[in-house]
């Protein structure tokens, strides 16, 4: 596979290999048959990051080969959205002869949406001044004149200049309902929008007719919490990153959802609060005992759940676990399967043509 050519003819083979691998990994837990959710074969990534290589008067996007660290020129990137692919050559064309914009530019990050918005972050090894800002504003305006719904950001050491805003608003139709999700550059968002919708709809289907409330750890910008809110009386969600919490609060308001409460704290801290080991000022005014959480939702980082959180999670009748690393999922399941059964298993092909697998399990406590 090269950055400019995807092995589309091998998509089915690579997906089948993942299904086999996940089935084998999960066999120890008596898991049901894998529900498989495919990706589009191209233009599936909504974000992309490139280094910028300067060669005389020319400059262009590059990536590095993960094995050899060889530099690879990238003029088109079919894994990324069509919007990113349209913008890449136009951006390079416009900054090639603009010394203020190209001088010590070393990276460009793109974050696009299905709704047609895009934010571009330009990273520099130099101080950004008023002159840069004026040149960047002219660049933004000329790209907007070409029809791009675009926002530009300049970054340098300890500097971030937003010409307008540092976010885009994504619009996704989830099980017949349009959801708006504010996504801030440089914070976590699901990269494959179409597969993200499939994940949300699977989570909705897995929690239909739920009793009580939902607790979610690692909620990010509210991606899952807001979609799942319709299945529960109330949702209590935790997140540690400030920009994600701010986005989640905005998303609650813009989607007119009134039964979701976001708390800014780490999952480990929340475990301590739930166990009565520590009190936190951030929890003032929130009576945790009022929540009747029958279901807990976790979408942890690649490292999985720590031992204390695993113990806390085990107290809930139903556990919905989304994992970006089946290896640590299986490590967690070694403990969780002593009290719970795996009743659903899903593979979401977020990252086609790579070894990465995103999967989901629903665990139900044994009686």
UniProtKB/Swiss-Prot annotation:
<dbReference type="GO" id="GO:0030697">
    <property type="term" value="F:tRNA (uracil(54)-C5)-methyltransferase activity, S-adenosyl methionine-dependent"/>
</dbReference>
<feature type="binding site">
    <location>
        <position position="223"/>
    </location>
    <ligand>
        <name>S-adenosyl-L-methionine</name>
    </ligand>
</feature>
<keyword id="KW-0808">Transferase</keyword>
<dbReference type="InterPro" id="IPR010280">
    <property type="entry name" value="U5_MeTrfase_fam"/>
</dbReference>
<feature type="binding site">
    <location>
        <position position="239"/>
    </location>
    <ligand>
        <name>S-adenosyl-L-methionine</name>
    </ligand>
</feature>
<dbReference type="GO" id="GO:0030488">
    <property type="term" value="P:tRNA methylation"/>
</dbReference>
<dbReference type="InterPro" id="IPR011869">
    <property type="entry name" value="TrmA_MeTrfase"/>
</dbReference>
<comment type="similarity">
    <text>Belongs to the class I-like SAM-binding methyltransferase superfamily. RNA M5U methyltransferase family. TrmA subfamily.</text>
</comment>
<dbReference type="Pfam" id="PF05958">
    <property type="entry name" value="tRNA_U5-meth_tr"/>
</dbReference>
<dbReference type="GO" id="GO:0005829">
    <property type="term" value="C:cytosol"/>
</dbReference>
<keyword id="KW-0489">Methyltransferase</keyword>
<dbReference type="InterPro" id="IPR029063">
    <property type="entry name" value="SAM-dependent_MTases_sf"/>
</dbReference>
<dbReference type="InterPro" id="IPR030391">
    <property type="entry name" value="MeTrfase_TrmA_CS"/>
</dbReference>
<feature type="active site" description="Proton acceptor">
    <location>
        <position position="358"/>
    </location>
</feature>
<comment type="function">
    <text>Dual-specificity methyltransferase that catalyzes the formation of 5-methyluridine at position 54 (m5U54) in all tRNAs, and that of position 341 (m5U341) in tmRNA (transfer-mRNA).</text>
</comment>
<dbReference type="GO" id="GO:0019843">
    <property type="term" value="F:rRNA binding"/>
</dbReference>
<keyword id="KW-0819">tRNA processing</keyword>
<feature type="active site" description="Nucleophile">
    <location>
        <position position="324"/>
    </location>
</feature>
<feature type="binding site">
    <location>
        <position position="218"/>
    </location>
    <ligand>
        <name>S-adenosyl-L-methionine</name>
    </ligand>
</feature>
<feature type="binding site">
    <location>
        <position position="190"/>
    </location>
    <ligand>
        <name>S-adenosyl-L-methionine</name>
    </ligand>
</feature>
<dbReference type="GO" id="GO:0000049">
    <property type="term" value="F:tRNA binding"/>
</dbReference>
<feature type="binding site">
    <location>
        <position position="299"/>
    </location>
    <ligand>
        <name>S-adenosyl-L-methionine</name>
    </ligand>
</feature>
<keyword id="KW-0949">S-adenosyl-L-methionine</keyword>
<protein>
    <recommendedName>
        <fullName>tRNA/tmRNA (uracil-C(5))-methyltransferase</fullName>
        <ecNumber>2.1.1.-</ecNumber>
        <ecNumber>2.1.1.35</ecNumber>
    </recommendedName>
</protein>
<dbReference type="InterPro" id="IPR030390">
    <property type="entry name" value="MeTrfase_TrmA_AS"/>
</dbReference>
């Amino acid at each position: 596979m090269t950055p400019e050519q995807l092995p589309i003819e091998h998509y089915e083979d690579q997906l089948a290999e993942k299904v086999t691998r996940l089935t084998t990994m999960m066999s120890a837990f008596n898991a049901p048959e894998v529900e498989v959710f495919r990706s589009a074969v191209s233009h599936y990534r909504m974000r992309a990051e490139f280094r910028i290589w300067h060669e005389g008067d020319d400059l262009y996007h590059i990536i590095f080969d993960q094995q050899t660290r060889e530099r690879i020129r990238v003029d088109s990137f079919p894994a990324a959205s069509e919007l990113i692919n349209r913008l890449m050559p136009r951006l390079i064309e416009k900054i090639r002869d603009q010394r203020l914009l190209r001088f010590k530019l070393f990276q460009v990050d793109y974050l696009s949406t299905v709704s047609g918005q895009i934010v571009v972050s330009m990273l520099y090894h130099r101080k950004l001044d008023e002159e840069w800002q004026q040149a960047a504003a002219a660049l933004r305006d000329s790209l907007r004149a070409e029809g791009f719904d675009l926002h530009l950001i300049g970054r340098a050491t300890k500097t971030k200049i937003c010409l307008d805003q540092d976010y885009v608003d994504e619009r996704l139709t989830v099980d017949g309902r349009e959801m708006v999700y504010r996504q801030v550059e440089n914070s976590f968002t699901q990269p494959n929008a179409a597969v993200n919708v499939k994940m949300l709809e699977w989570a909705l289907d897995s929690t239909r007719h739920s009793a009580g409330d939902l607790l979610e750890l690692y909620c990010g910008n509210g991606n899952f919490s807001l979609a799942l809110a319709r299945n529960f009386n109330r949702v209590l969600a935790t997140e540690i990153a400030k920009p994600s919490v701010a986005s989640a609060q905005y998303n609650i308001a813009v989607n007119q959802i009134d039964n979701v409460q976001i708390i800014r704290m780490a999952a480990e801290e929340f475990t301590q609060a739930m166990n009565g080991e520590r009190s936190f000022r951030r929890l003032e005014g929130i009576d945790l005992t009022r929540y009747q959480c029958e279901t807990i939702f976790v979408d942890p980082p690649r490292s999985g759940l720590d031992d204390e959180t695993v113990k806390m999670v085990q107290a809930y009748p139903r556990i919905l676990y989304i994992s970006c690393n089946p290896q640590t999922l299986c490590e967690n399941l070694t403990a969780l399967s002593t009290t719970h059964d795996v009743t659903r298993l899903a593979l979401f092909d977020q990252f086609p043509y790579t070894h990465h697998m995103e999967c989901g399990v629903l665990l139900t406590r044994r009686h």
